[in-house]
């Protein structure tokens, strides 16, 4: 989130930093970027380091009147390298490094706005821009119980396997005889 009145223009731009570009983060530290670091910008200036930390120049303060909420997904490898390059590891960078499900971005922003209203911290005035051009499809893996038992050294029935897989949010598709992983499970292919 950022203070709308500290931003210039209505644009949100994602761009690569210039080599040796300086930026002051929310913690008051000046950071030196290279051209691999992604920056979140308004119409005129950088206001945050993508997936890592916002800028001091657009921070929320006690006198904030209007906030802009942003939900995004960035490439985990880029965030990890950028975080290391600038010497700043944050909760945000840790989450992005592991990979986030872009399908959850809209639900996350909706929940943040809902909480703002429920807590009496503000009023949501609406309006959303979605620039996500793709969604992630669930991964599908051929279900081969015999092969699984051989690999694990077990003698589980097909039904037992389906039950166990269901406990970790993996669904069985009878029509295709496949295990379907939810989109947030990027580790299953």
Predicted regions and their residues:
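RNA/tRNA-interacting regions in translation and RNA-turnover enzymes
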Residues: 2-189
